[in-house]
Regions:
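Juxtamembrane intracellular "pre-TM" segments in multi-pass secondary transporters
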Residues: 187-219, 242-243
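Helix-loop-helix hairpin linking two adjacent transmembrane segments in secondary transporters
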Residues: 137-181, 185
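Extracellular/periplasmic helix-loop-helix junction of adjacent transmembrane segments
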Residues: 29-58
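Extracytoplasmic gate region of multi-pass secondary transporters
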Residues: 26-27, 213-260
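Cytoplasmic helix-loop-helix junction between adjacent transmembrane helices
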Residues: 102-143
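Helix-breaking motifs and short loop linkers at transmembrane-helix boundaries and internal kinks
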Residues: 38, 71, 92-98, 109, ...
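Conserved small/polar residues in nucleotide/adenosyl-binding loops
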Residues: 265-267
């Protein structure tokens, strides 16, 4: 791989790191947020699950479609700015509704990270090295998950959950600037010996995907897996605190390095 391709891959992996770091830090701070905002477990469920996942899932395809037709570094930088701003604003929430809006905004913003990055990686790495490039990109998510849980738990005990959100949202703003000013837009299809000239409608794209049985099997499998794994990761810190009376620092370290290490082995 050329030096620029390596730099680009590192930048995209860093964006994915921040993506999962910001996504997971909420879970280790739920007990503090619940106490400060006087929330019920049902409301916490909306914040950790439906509010984020619904808009993340619904906007994934439209944003992926936008990445197919527009300048991808702009799509990625706007996504970074959006979810980072929502993460920082979460620290200002004074009630459930405000936090809900910020979580929805975070899910909408993060929906643009993975599809746009995958498209860029495919056009900057040859087919024989693409699997390794995607593994590096995915490792960024795993490390971000580890950091969000482990460091987020400790930081929240030092500066409180509000400032933790602000500090966690800041790196994404810096990455957005790097994406805008240093990322080059590669020619679509250049690594596969093809150029993209024909325009395909969104409905045609969706029909094409749904007609592939292998895609449907993967879609169902990943949906079920993520339903279980993210539900587990979002609620286990609260369970450990209530059941074993552990501190947020201890819980963050256990969850971050425990789950993160298993994820890295899986990669």
């Amino acid at each position: 791989m050329k030096k620029y391709s390596i730099y680009m891959l590192g930048l995209l992996a860093a964006a994915n790191f921040v993506n999962y770091m910001d996504r997971m830090v909420l879970s280790v701070m739920l007990p503090s947020i619940k106490a400060d905002l006087d929330l019920s477990d049902g409301q916490l469920g909306w914040l950790t699950g439906m509010s984020f996942a619904l808009f993340y899932g619904l906007l994934g395809l439209p944003i992926a479609r936008l990445a197919d037709t527009w300048i991808r570094k702009h799509v990625l930088s706007i996504s970074l700015l959006a979810w980072s701003a929502m993460t920082m604003l979460s620290g200002s929430a004074s009630n459930f509704l405000q936090m809900l809006v910020f979580r929805i905004g975070g899910g909408a913003g993060e929906a643009g990270c993975i599809p746009t990055s995958h498209s860029l990686i495919a056009d900057l790495t040859p087919p024989e090295k693409r699997a390794g490039a995607f593994a590096v990109f995915t490792a960024g998510a795993t490390l971000g998950l580890m950091f969000g849980l482990a460091f987020g738990g400790w930081l929240s005990t030092q500066v409180g959950w509000r400032w933790t959100f602000v500090l966690f949202g800041t790196p994404g703003l810096l990455l957005a600037a790097l994406v805008v000013f240093t990322l080059k837009e590669p020619e679509r299809g250049q690594m596969d010996g093809a150029s993209v000239t024909a325009k395909v409608s969104t409905s045609e794209s969706i029909r094409g995907l749904l007609s592939r049985r292998s895609y449907l099997h993967l879609l169902i499998g990943f949906s079920v897996t993520n339903f279980v794994s993210f539900g587990f990761m979002q609620w286990m810190p609260t369970y450990y605190m209530r059941t074993f009376d552990l501190s947020m620092t201890t819980i963050g370290l256990l969850m971050g390095f425990g789950v993160g290490a298993l994820s890295l082995i899986h990669i």
